[in-house]
């Protein structure tokens, strides 16, 4: 049976009223005057209509030919850098030729413009007052205002999407990458008004430096001789499309020194051994790159043994003459050291964030912005104040009828036992150490294991085998062989298949961690736990307790649950789903991975998981029907009940993808239910979760915040700065250890359950207290967190992924979608991903 749900997003049913009423400051600035005239909208085609780099299209827009064609209308026109343009004036339809080359070497490209429609910004006033639904007219109006707001900062700053940077005071992150701090601004529709959301933005950029110096830092080479031995072709994918100039002593100040090249890769041979054919006096001549620069530019290469960079048209340039162009974002994934440096750079106390936002607002000086002024747009320079509520903290149940009432979102495990330890004792397990005996001697491991077993025993986990066999990894063997050896050793000593395997790693890195997880999760079907050697040496009971929380759920236990009074699910059997899609980073191979977790108990504490591969960068989850059928059957098998309600938390979707979630994923959930029985029709609620936004909230009174100056856990914001009529709210559910608390933005897309807002908001908040591996409330509902964890581990089951940077063709980036390595059936009912 096919099901076609409504394409409308759920409307706000009302507001909540529970909790302490407070007032917060929000980083939104109200637009007090909008353009009150009709704006002409035009369709723009550059060249043959194929995608043109944004920088090039912006150069064309700023060309003298386009300015002459537009006349006086150019100054009040706004261009999106792609295919749309808006103007107060009338511009004739037509096509002109623009020279994008030099005067000596002209290169013409066509620029066509055609009027497509008119937009009336009065529709925005109706929209924010819930008198007009969202349609292309509203979206075009918001896009126009966004671009109008960007126009002035775009003239002098480095801009990316909604963020702008001066490029000054960068801080090194290592590897030729540095962190810049700038500001973010975006037009937002709110309840009764439009506003500008302003925030601090931090991003990683390639350092404006010699490419040679950056390569040496990236490869950790201390001198150029070491770099000549390094296979730079392996880095082709990493450095591809990086823009450089070619500068040497004999072209300083010339157009040639300013010409920008885009790296395509690195040559396999050195500059002295890389040859090309040129025509000289009518004859073809073979010449090396090193010889060419000596003959044609009178410069001798200092490092002729280094390879060259490859650019378009097959040209080759010596690395030592190349300089990285300023203002290029570093889009690859930061390594662990760079990430730590970025966190230190970006973290700010709340009052510092407020001050910097206010400073940026005054620097932008919207009142004197000529583009805003000519359209009559005025923006208030004071942060909005918004009403908020602080919900009551839930109570948590542990074993032995122990009830915990957290304070400020935190508690500890002292004197507590897990609610539901594994019924069978731990009879068989083993430890493998990937650190040398010199760095971590056996005595250190034995001391740790004694504390570890004592701590887990006090938490309720019963160990028959208190002293497991310990092996040191033989680095000559593969990780697969080592895992199998450890499995057999545990089985031999314990006379039973291992309950889990324990691995001690030297540091937190993708390997051998990834291989351990792949082998244990797919081949051996045994839970695995990894720990870092420095923690083993310290042997702290608190660290052991943290490991215990993971071990307990991996072997089938439950750590804690909400007390009945704190659980809004009540007695109605409810399946909770969490969904997420992981996409490979820039330059990485591999497929996208969709992961769904589902509760298999009546309290929403225990979750099983499914992950599937799908085409790269596809956000809608494929095969949702089959996945949900499997998860519904699992819920029934574990609880002996059929869920009467399904609550689906979906992460990672942008506002533009909301309808896709309704029309595709919700439809398949419905079909899954009907496939089990034509009469089976549970009520469904679909809610998206978003953390990648720039809404931030700051306390007005100290008594309404924590010791760091952030709003308290349980703070709900659902008025003023939320959507004009859709059912959304912001929730700060966690205590922030450092920096500014990031609220999660919840948007209910579809609601058949019709829980009152108070009940649903309380459910979202209270679930954050039963995340299985923490003794603090987390920032996001656990099913979504679990889906993240599943996706992260499922990457190691992707047979097409390759974390090494090798030369890659465009075709290989669109490779066939192969299924992930199958999860062992022995793990399917356990929380193996913790």
Curated annotation (Swiss-Prot):
InterPro entries: ArgoL1, ArgoL2, Argonaute_Mid_dom, Argonaute_N, PAZ_dom, PAZ_dom_sf, Piwi, Piwi_ago-like
Name of the protein in question: Protein argonaute
Family classification: Belongs to the argonaute family. Ago subfamily.
One of the record's GO molecular function terms: siRNA binding
Keyword annotations of the record: Cell cycle, Centromere, Chromosome, Chromosome partition, Cytoplasm, Nucleus, RNA-mediated gene silencing, Telomere
Domain Piwi: 500-799
Location(s) in or outside the cell: Cytoplasm; Nucleus; Chromosome, Centromere; Chromosome, Telomere
Keyword presence, Acetylation: no
Domain PAZ: 210-326
Gene3D superfamilies linked: 3.40.50.2300, paz domain, Ribonuclease H-like superfamily/Ribonuclease H
One cellular component (GO) term of this entry: pericentric heterochromatin
Tree of life domain: Eukaryota
Oligomer and partners: Ago1, chp1 and tas3 interact to form the core of the RNA-induced transcriptional silencing (RITS) complex. The RITS complex interacts with the RDRC complex via interaction between ago1 and hrr1. Clr4 has a role in mediating this interaction. Component of the argonaute siRNA chaperone (ARC) complex composed of ago1, arb1 and arb2. Interacts with arb1.
Biological process terms in GO annotation: chromosome segregation; co-transcriptional gene silencing by RNA interference machinery; negative regulation of G0 to G1 transition; priRNA 3'-end processing; regulatory ncRNA-mediated gene silencing; regulatory ncRNA-mediated heterochromatin formation; silent mating-type cassette heterochromatin formation; siRNA 3'-end processing
Outcome of substituting residue 580 to A: Lower target RNA cleavage activity. Up-regulated centromeric transcripts from the dg and dh heterochromatic repeats. Defective for centromeric heterochromatin assembly and silencing. Decreased association with siRNAs
Effect of residue 788 to A: Up-regulated centromeric transcripts from the dg and dh heterochromatic repeats. Reduced siRNA corresponding to heterochromatic repeats
Organism: Schizosaccharomyces pombe (strain 972 / ATCC 24843) (Fission yeast)
Protein's job: Required for G1 arrest and mating in response to nitrogen starvation. Ago1 regulation of cytokinesis and cell cycle checkpoints occurs downstream of dcr1. Required, indirectly, for regulated hyperphosphorylation of cdc2. Has a role in the RNA interference (RNAi) pathway which is important for heterochromatin formation, accurate chromosome segregation, centromere cohesion and telomere function during mitosis and meiosis. Required for silencing at the centromeres and for initiation of transcriptionally silent heterochromatin at the mating type locus.
Keyword Nucleus recorded: yes
């Amino acid at each position: 049976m096919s099901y076609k749900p409504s394409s409308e997003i759920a409307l706000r049913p009302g507001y909540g009223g529970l909790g302490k009423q407070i007032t917060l400051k929000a980083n939104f600035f109200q637009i007090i005057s909008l353009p009150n005239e009709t704006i002409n909208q035009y369709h723009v085609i550059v060249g043959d209509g194929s995608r043109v780099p944004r920088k090039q299209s912006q150069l064309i827009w700023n060309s003298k030919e386009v300015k002459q064609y537009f006349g006086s209308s150019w100054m009040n026109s706004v261009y999106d850098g792609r295919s749309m343009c808006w103007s107060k004036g009338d511009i004739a339809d037509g096509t002109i030729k623009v020279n994008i080359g030099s005067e000596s070497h002209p290169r013409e490209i066509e620029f066509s413009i055609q009027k497509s429609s008119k937009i009336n910004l009065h529709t925005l006033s109706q929209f924010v007052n819930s008198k007009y639904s969202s349609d292309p007219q509203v979206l075009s109006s918001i896009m126009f205002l966004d671009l109008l707001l960007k126009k002035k900062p775009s003239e002098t700053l480095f801009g990316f999407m909604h963020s702008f940077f001066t490029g000054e005071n960068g801080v090194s992150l290592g590897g030729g990458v540095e962190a810049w701090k700038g500001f973010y601004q975006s037009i937002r529709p709110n309840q009764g008004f439009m506003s500008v959301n302003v925030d601090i933005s931090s991003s990683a950029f390639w350092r404006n430096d010699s490419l040679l110096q950056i390569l040496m830092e990236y490869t950790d080479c201390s001198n150029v001789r070491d770099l000549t031995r390094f296979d730079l072709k392996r880095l082709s994918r990493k450095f591809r499309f990086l823009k450089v100039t070619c500068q040497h002593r004999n072209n300083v100040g010339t157009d040639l020194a300013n010409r920008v090249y885009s790296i395509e890769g690195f040559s396999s041979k050195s500059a002295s051994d890389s040859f090309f054919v040129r025509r000289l006096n009518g004859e073809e001549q073979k010449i090396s790159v090193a010889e060419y620069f000596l003959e044609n530019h009178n410069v001798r290469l200092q490092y002729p043994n280094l390879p060259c960079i490859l650019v378009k048209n097959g040209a080759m340039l010596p690395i030592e003459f190349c300089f990285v162009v300023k203002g290029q974002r570093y889009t690859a994934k930061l390594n662990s050291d760079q990430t730590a440096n970025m966190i230190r750079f970006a973290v700010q106390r709340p009052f510092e964030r407020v001050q910097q936002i206010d400073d940026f607002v005054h620097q932008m000086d919207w009142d004197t912005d000529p583009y805003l002024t000519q359209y009559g747009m005025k923006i208030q320079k004071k942060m909005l104040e918004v009403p908020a509520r602080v919900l009551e903290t839930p109570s948590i149940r542990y074993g032995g009828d122990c009830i915990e009432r957290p304070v400020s979102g935190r508690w500890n495990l002292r004197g507590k036992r897990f609610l539901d330890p594994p019924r069978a004792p731990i009879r068989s397990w083993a430890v493998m150490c990937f650190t040398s005996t010199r760095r971590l001697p056996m005595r250190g491991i034995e001391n740790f294991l004694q504390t570890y077993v004592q701590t887990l025993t006090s938490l309720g986990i019963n160990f028959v085998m208190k002293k497991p066999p310990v092996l040191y990894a033989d680095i000559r063997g593969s990780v697969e062989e080592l895992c199998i050896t450890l499995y057999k050793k545990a089985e031999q000593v314990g006379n039973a298949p291992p309950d889990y395997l324990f691995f001690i790693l030297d540091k937190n890195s993708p390997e051998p961690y990834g291989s351990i997880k792949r082998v244990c999760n797919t081949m051996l079907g045994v839970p695995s736990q990894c720990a870092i050697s420095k923690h083993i040496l310290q042997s702290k009971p608190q660290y052991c307790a943290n490991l215990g929380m993971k071990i307990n759920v991996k072997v089938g236990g439950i750590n804690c649950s909400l007390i009945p009074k704190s659980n809004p699910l009540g007695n109605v059997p409810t399946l909770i789903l969490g969904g997420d899609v992981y996409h490979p980073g820039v330059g990485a191979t591999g497929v996208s991975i969709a992961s769904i977790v589902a509760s298999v108990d009546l309290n929403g504490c225990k979750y099983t998981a499914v992950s599937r591969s799908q085409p790269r960068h596809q956000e809608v989850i494929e095969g949702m029907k089959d996945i949900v059928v499997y998860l519904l059957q699992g819920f029934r098998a574990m609880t002996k009940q059929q869920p009467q309600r399904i609550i689906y938390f979906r992460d990672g979707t942008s506002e533009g993808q909301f309808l896709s979630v309704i029309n595709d994923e919700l439809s398949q959930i419905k079909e899954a239910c009907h496939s089990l029985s034509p009469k089976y029709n549970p009520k469904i609620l679909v809610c998206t979760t978003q953390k990648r936004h720039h809404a931030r909230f700051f306390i007005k009174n100290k008594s309404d915040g924590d010791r760091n100056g952030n709003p308290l856990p349980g703070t709900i914001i659902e008025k003023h700065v939320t959507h004009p009529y859709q059912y959304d709210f912001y929730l700060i559910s966690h205590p922030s250890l450092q920096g500014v608390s990031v609220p999660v933005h919840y948007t209910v897309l579809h609601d058949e359950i019709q829980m009152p807002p108070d009940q649903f908001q309380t459910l979202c908040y209270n679930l954050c207290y039963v995340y299985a591996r923490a003794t603090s409330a987390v920032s996001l509902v656990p099913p979504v967190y679990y889906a993240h964890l599943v996706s992260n581990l499922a990457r190691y089951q992707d047979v097409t992924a390759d974390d090494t940077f090798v030369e890659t063709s465009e075709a290989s980036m669109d490779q066939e979608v192969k299924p992930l390595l199958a999860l062992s059936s022995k793990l399917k009912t356990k929380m193996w991903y913790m």
